[in-house]
């Protein structure tokens, strides 16, 4: 609609344009329509060479023939009695009974019509079925001769009135039915008073059955006659056309005869109705009649059920006949006994009128929608007489009614961390059904086909709190005793069944067998068990918290008692034993006093480390996640956490746990929550290095130590590197003392000599041999992906706490730099595709634009002018990305073979950097040894 301000002329113009467009379109259509011959070929037009006048006559003839056929059918239409018999005309049940049973003989119009053949064939097959289902009766005569009371019992009293007189009348005079009805009424009161002693419903089938033989024979006679007469109706041929008026004259006699029959039937029908009404008024039976018979008749007409239905609505409650084939015929209570009968199993199939009648009989409110009526009846059924044979299918929502039964289903990524984790890469089918058995042990059944992969590195590490029995292959094994897990699952008392779900996400329901089990138990016992579980869990939680506090105090004491000279660490085994502790800081952050720890952020649990966390077999990746808690700094430092994990979530801080990636890579996640501002980053506990003394990693399972520090991301790329880093001695003075392993490695000394000779570091740097584990020749970083050629991270990244000595730390710290400078994880363990790319782009632009780092001697990637400040406070204390060292020197300097045999961490890794970012000779590493 154009704006109102536009003038009327504009609208006019628009309308005319639209009209013109429509006109053009129609003209085009007319022009492009196919030829007549084409239309004839496609049977759209008829091929006729006749003149138009002939065609017009042909049409007239067709119409006349149609009209003729219709007139014939109207003339021979069935009378009202036949309509009642065929369940087309709704009438009161008593009338219908009399007519259907055949006690009233009436002239059948349909005998001479072809119409009846079709209609009776269509309608009659239902009757035999219904009769047979109602039980067999010896002979039709038996019912006719049967005692009036017997025939009356199953029907309502009014039926007796109409049936018995008709039975006597029909043999004498059809049209004098007024007189005889008067004697029988006295029979009715006894039948009413003795309502309780009424026999079974067998009499109902008796009445119905009696008409079956007759109707079958009539049908056969009728169909024979109709077949004989059919040619008469269709005998008019095209050239013998006779106009309708002449035809009527000629066909008047038969039409009159059929019309006379219809009139006869009409009279008889009216008389029956009048009789019926008189009887009703005379005996005042309206009060005990069932729901209006008309609705029953309509229901029958619409649903096509056999006439049995209308009878069975009025059956007594004691009647035990089987329901009719459609499931609609039911034995209800009647006016005779007044007791409500058993409801059928399928209430949904009942009509609203029937439901209301049932409710009336049970003196329940009748108003409301069909569903409400059904609910009311169901409730009544459950209270009074639950039918054991017909259990109702419970609604899906009402399965878990019982207090003790709970099945918790959540995506695998969200276990125990609540909203703290971003469930990034999970398919909806990867639902973990976590169930707590009565022993308090949490069991997990994953419904995904592969073990769910954690979208963020912290996800699993928060869960595992050192269950020594769990094997590394069992991805959820470490969680079994996690207090966090149990707390999240046990907000309410639980008595839970372990059930492996199918791939339907979130539809967790208890198996019926289990439900029966639970119901059988004593409820008091269950409650006691639950109380015990809760107490045990709270006790465990308190113990963990005390442990956290103790370790926190220990760390603070050690931090105060630190001396500048750290202990040297041996490099004897092919697995690097990294005992050095990272004391480096973001160069931007001034050395402040050590901040007291948030108890929930301390990382004590590293001494629970699972001895089998380093699994032999597929290559593992140690992903350490550090939650650094930035304090307010002069430069704006928005805290960008990897997931929305608050510090309070990391209470039971976890040992490195094993997660199997979708590519088969094991990711060992350790959480070392760090305080970004305590210069020593001392929350990486000193016990950590010795926590895995006895597990040397086998050669194939080289692990990559990707530390993901959750670092503040600073406002501008260059602001990161503006400040000069603190001196080496200062940094060292704040470094916690590491456990000394005694044998200072000769290889490390050689490395320092080489570096000093090449002019890469100053001579006074020879002092700290304690940082061997941190040497990170970047060319070998991430399993041969082009990432690997990055220079080792320079001093401005805070190196996180070293991994346990059992895990051979890769000499690649590029990721630390990437994360510390951007605050984002470089490689997430799962399916994160494009995210790392943007991170690397940011980093690339930062490194290219920052001028503070360009005063360093050229590194192997001189082409991209990436130089790093040789900061003495860096964890390595030496910048190993030396231009004079060839890539092969790095291979020799590294701590042996296993480091190179890494499998790719993620499928997106090779695409992280463009290859022009690297210098030529850096790319000549042994990529194939990595793959």
Swiss-Prot record:
UniProt motif Bipartite Nuclear localization signal: location: 27-65
Region of interest: Mediates interaction with SCAI and ACTB: 1-256
Bias (Low complexity): 310-320, 678-694, 784-799
GO MF annotation, one: actin binding
Residue ranges occupied by any SAP domain in the UniProt entry: 347-381
PTMs per UniProt: Phosphorylation at Ser-6 by Erk inhibits binding of globular actin (G-actin), unmasking the nuclear localization signal (NLS) and promoting nuclear import.
Sequence positions bearing Phosphoserine: 6, 124, 139, 156, 310, 312, 317, 320, 333, 385, 446, 449, 454, 458, 482, 492, 507, 511, 685, 691, 695, 792, 807, 859
Site (Breakpoint for translocation to form RBM15-MRTFA): 3-4
Domain of life: Eukaryota
S-S bonds: none
Disordered: region residues: 110-256, 290-344, 444-476, 558-577, 674-746, 763-816
Any Pfam family: RPEL
Regions of compositional bias (Polar residues) in chain numbering: 151-162, 191-215, 459-473, 732-746
Comment text on domains: The N-terminal region is required for nuclear localization and the C-terminal region mediates transcriptional activity.
Assembly: Interacts with SRF, forming the SRF-MRTFA nuclear complex which binds the 5'-CArG-3' consensus motif (CArG box) on DNA via SRF. Interacts (via RPEL repeats) with globular actin (G-actin), thereby regulating its subcellular location and activity of the complex formed with SRF. Either forms a trivalent (by binding three G-actin monomers) or pentavalent (by binding five G-actin monomers) complex with G-actin. Forms a nuclear ternary complex with SCAI and SRF, leading to suppress MRTFA-induced SRF transcriptional activity.
PANTHER family hit by this protein: MYOCARDIN-RELATED TRANSCRIPTION FACTOR A (PTHR22793:SF6), MYOCARDIN-RELATED TRANSCRIPTION FACTOR-RELATED (PTHR22793)
Biological function: Transcription coactivator that associates with the serum response factor (SRF) transcription factor to control expression of genes regulating the cytoskeleton during development, morphogenesis and cell migration. The SRF-MRTFA complex activity responds to Rho GTPase-induced changes in cellular globular actin (G-actin) concentration, thereby coupling cytoskeletal gene expression to cytoskeletal dynamics. MRTFA binds G-actin via its RPEL repeats, regulating activity of the MRTFA-SRF complex. Activity is also regulated by filamentous actin (F-actin) in the nucleus.
Protein name: Myocardin-related transcription factor A
């Amino acid at each position: 609609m154009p704006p109102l301000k536009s003038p009327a002329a504009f609208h006019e113009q628009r309308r005319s344009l639209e009209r013109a467009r429509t006109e053009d379109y129609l003209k085009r259509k007319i022009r492009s329509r196919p030829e007549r011959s084409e239309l004839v070929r496609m049977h759209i037009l008829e091929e006729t060479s006749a003149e138009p006048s002939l065609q017009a006559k042909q049409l007239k003839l067709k119409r006349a023939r149609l009209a003729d056929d219709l007139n014939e059918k109207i003339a021979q239409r069935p009378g009202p009695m036949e309509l009642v018999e065929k369940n087309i005309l709704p009438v009161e049940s008593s009338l219908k009974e009399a007519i259907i049973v055949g006690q009233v003989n009436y002239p059948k119009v349909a005998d001479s019509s072809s119409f009846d053949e079709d209609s009776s064939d269509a309608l009659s097959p239902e009757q035999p079925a219904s009769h047979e289902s109602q039980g067999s009766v010896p002979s039709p005569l038996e019912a006719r001769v049967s005692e009036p009371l017997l025939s009356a019992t199953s029907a309502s009293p009014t039926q007796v009135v109409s049936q018995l007189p008709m039975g006597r009348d029909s043999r004498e005079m059809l049209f004098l039915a007024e007189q005889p009805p008067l004697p029988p009424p006295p029979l009715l009161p006894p039948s009413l008073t003795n309502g309780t002693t009424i026999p079974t419903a067998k009499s109902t089938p008796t009445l119905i059955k009696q008409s079956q033989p007759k109707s079958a024979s009539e049908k056969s006679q009728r169909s024979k006659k109709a077949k004989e007469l059919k040619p008469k109706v269709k005998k008019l041929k095209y050239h013998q056309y006779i106009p309708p008026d002449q035809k009527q004259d000629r066909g008047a006699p038969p039409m009159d005869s059929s019309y006379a029959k219809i009139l006869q039937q009409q009279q008889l029908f009216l008389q029956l109705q009048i009789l019926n009404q008189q009887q009703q008024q005379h005996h005042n039976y309206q009060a005990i009649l069932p729901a209006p018979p008309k609705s029953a008749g309509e229901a029958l007409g619409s649903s096509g059920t056999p006439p049995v239905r209308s009878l069975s609505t009025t059956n007594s409650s004691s009647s035990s006949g089987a329901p009719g084939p459609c499931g609609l015929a039911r034995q209800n209570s009647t006016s005779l006994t007044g007791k409500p009968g058993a409801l059928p199993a399928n209430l949904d199939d009942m009509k609203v009128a029937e439901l209301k009648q049932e409710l009336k009989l049970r003196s329940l409110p009748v108003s409301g929608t069909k569903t409400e009526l059904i609910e009311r009846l169901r409730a009544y059924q459950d209270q009074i007489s639950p039918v054991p044979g017909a259990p109702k299918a419970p609604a899906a929502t009402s399965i878990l009614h019982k207090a003790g039964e709970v099945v918790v289903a959540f995506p695998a990524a969200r276990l125990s961390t609540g909203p703290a984790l971003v469930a990034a890469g999970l398919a909806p089918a990867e639902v973990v059904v976590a169930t707590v058995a009565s022993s308090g042990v949490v069991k997990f059944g994953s419904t995904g086909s592969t073990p769910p992969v954690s979208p963020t590195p912290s996800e699993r590490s928060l869960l595992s709190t050192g269950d020594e029995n769990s094997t590394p292959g069992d991805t959820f094994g470490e969680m079994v005793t996690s207090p966090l897990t149990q707390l999240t699952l046990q907000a309410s008392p639980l008595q839970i069944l372990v059930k492996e779900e199918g791939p339907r996400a979130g539809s967790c329901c208890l198996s019926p067998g289990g439900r029966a089990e639970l119901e059988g138990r004593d409820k008091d016992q269950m409650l006691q068990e639950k109380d015990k579980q809760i107490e045990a869990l709270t006790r465990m939680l308190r113990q963990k918290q005390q442990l956290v506090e103790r370790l926190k105090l220990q760390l603070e004491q050690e931090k105060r008692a630190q001396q500048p000279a750290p202990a040297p660490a041996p490099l004897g085994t092919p697995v690097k034993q990294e005992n050095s502790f990272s004391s480096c800081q973001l160069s931007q952050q001034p050395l402040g006093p050590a901040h007291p720890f948030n108890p929930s952020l301390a990382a004590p649990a590293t001494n629970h480390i699972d001895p089998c966390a380093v699994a032999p077999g597929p290559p593992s990746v140690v992903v350490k996640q550090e939650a650094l808690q930035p304090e307010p700094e002069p430069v704006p430092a928005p805290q960008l956490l990897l997931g929305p994990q608050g510090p309070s979530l990391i209470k039971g801080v976890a040992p490195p746990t094993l997660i199997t990636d979708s590519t088969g890579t094991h990711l060992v996640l350790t959480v070392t929550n760090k305080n970004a501002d305590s210069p020593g980053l001392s929350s990486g506990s000193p016990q950590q290095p010795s926590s895995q003394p006895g597990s040397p990693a086998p050669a194939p399972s080289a692990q990559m130590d990707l530390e993901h520090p959750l670092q503040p991301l600073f406002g501008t790329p260059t602001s990161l590197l503006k400040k000069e880093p603190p001196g080496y001695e200062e940094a060292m003075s704040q470094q916690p003392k590491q456990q000394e392993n005694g044998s200072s490695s000769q290889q490390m000394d050689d490395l320092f000599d080489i570096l000093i000779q090449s002019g890469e570091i100053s001579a006074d740097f020879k002092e700290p041999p304690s940082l061997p584990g941190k040497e990170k020749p970047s060319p070998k970083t991430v399993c041969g992906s082009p990432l690997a050629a990055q220079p080792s991270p320079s001093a401005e990244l805070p190196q996180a706490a070293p991994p346990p000595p059992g895990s051979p730390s890769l000499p690649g710290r590029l990721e630390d730099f990437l994360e510390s400078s951007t605050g984002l994880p470089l490689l997430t363990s799962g399916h994160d595709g494009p995210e790392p790319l943007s991170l690397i782009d940011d980093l690339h632009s930062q490194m290219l634009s920052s001028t503070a780092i360009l005063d360093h001697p050229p590194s192997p990637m001189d082409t991209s002018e990436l130089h790093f400040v040789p900061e003495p406070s860096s964890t390595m204390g030496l910048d190993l990305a030396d231009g004079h060292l060839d890539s092969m020197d790095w291979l020799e300097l590294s701590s042996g073979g296993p480091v190179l045999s890494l499998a790719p961490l993620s499928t997106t890794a090779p695409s992280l950097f463009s290859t022009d970012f690297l210098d030529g000779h850096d790319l000549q590493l042994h990529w194939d040894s990595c793959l």
